[in-house]
């Protein structure tokens, strides 16, 4: 009942997601693979600058076993590790980076397709700017997608820091460092497949 009341993933009497929300899950950081910050000026496989939480090619963490190997260009988002991989047609990891996904159970696992994009969007409450919004699914509460870390419209203050990426902090969408959001904007056109694990 607690999980349903607070819209958490129902994962047992007190499973990982509920325990994480309560702040009582031991070793939560063990699920998050933090790669060393790239060297100044480092770029990914298509020449775009890497963020402090990004890596590319052989420096990227290994893809999860269930990441749809052999299925072509796609974006893979693994909720447990709070990580995204962008994979090209040749099965190369163009870029991988930490994100901040939803605290709630509104990230629908499975295959999706990008169906809408907005270079600038507003949050559901019209209080926050969401740069580089890429939508891939919709729930009864609204669109779910990837975007840069939002900022409050009235003050311009960011809702979180880049250092906080890797933690579930959003209300639904997947937050990215600005450089990673700009990269994904160039990589994921309408029709690009998204796999949520």
Give the residues covered by each predicted segment.
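Secondary-structure transition/capping residues
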Residues: 10, 29, 33, 191-195
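Generic anion/oxyanion-binding catalytic loop in active/binding sites
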Residues: 8, 73, 170
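Cell wall/extracellular polymer interaction/catalysis modules
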Residues: 18-120, 131-133
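Exported/periplasmic cell-wall-interacting domains
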Residues: 13, 68-70, 107-111, 118-197
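Short acidic, glycine/serine/threonine-rich helix-capping segments at coil-helix boundaries
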Residues: 1-24, 31
């Amino acid at each position: 009942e607690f999980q349903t009341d607070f819209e958490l993933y129902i994962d047992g009497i007190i499973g990982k997601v509920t325990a994480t929300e309560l702040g009582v899950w031991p070793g939560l950081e063990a699920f998050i693979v933090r790669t060393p910050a790239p060297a100044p000026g480092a770029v990914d496989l298509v020449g775009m600058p890497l963020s402090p939480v990004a890596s590319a090619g052989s420096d990227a963490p290994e893809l999860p076993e269930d990441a749809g190997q052999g299925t072509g260009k796609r974006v893979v988002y693994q909720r447990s590790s709070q990580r995204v991989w962008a994979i090209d047609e040749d099965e190369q990891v163009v870029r991988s980076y930490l994100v901040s996904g939803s605290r709630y159970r509104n990230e629908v696992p499975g295959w999706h397709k990008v169906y809408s994009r907005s270079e600038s969007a507003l949050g559901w409450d019209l209080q926050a700017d969401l740069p580089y919004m890429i939508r891939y699914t919709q729930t009864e509460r609204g669109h779910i997608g990837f975007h840069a870390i939002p900022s409050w419209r009235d003050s311009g203050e960011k809702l979180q820091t880049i250092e906080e990426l890797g933690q579930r902090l959003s209300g639904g969408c997947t937050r990215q460092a600005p450089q990673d959001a700009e990269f994904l904007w160039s990589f994921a056109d309408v029709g690009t497949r998204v796999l949520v694990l």
